[in-house]
Amino acid sequence: MSIEAFTRLFDEVFTKGHLDAADELVAPKIIDHQFAPDGSPGRTMTRDQFKAFVRALRAGIPDLHYTVEDAAQAGDKVWLRVRARGTDNGTGQFGHPPTGKPISIDVIDVARFADGRMVEHWGVPDRMGVLQQLGHHV
């Protein structure tokens, strides 16, 4: 069940922007261990804050599309290898002004589920690769 829930989260919420689906798939509070796009460390966030994060991400990359490349589950944890594609058109999501360039980013995402909802998340995006694609010297 959790692989399906995590895959659905990427498809419906991140790719299609159906934020109401997060009500079913995300707990009222989650612990997110991934660094935020601005470099701040992981944090506890409410479901509404999670939705705001997705909204901001989609504003910066309006044609954002995720493809789940691989999935595995052990107990209450699910691992996904995903590829995100889109165009850097919006709000300077990556700490630099928008470039209008296409991006493709590989991400390893791990989530812990309880009662069918995500309660904890770890994400490892290839941010260096994205910055290089956008022409930034790092």
Region annotations inferred by a language model:
Residues 1-138:
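C-terminal and inter-domain tail/linker signature
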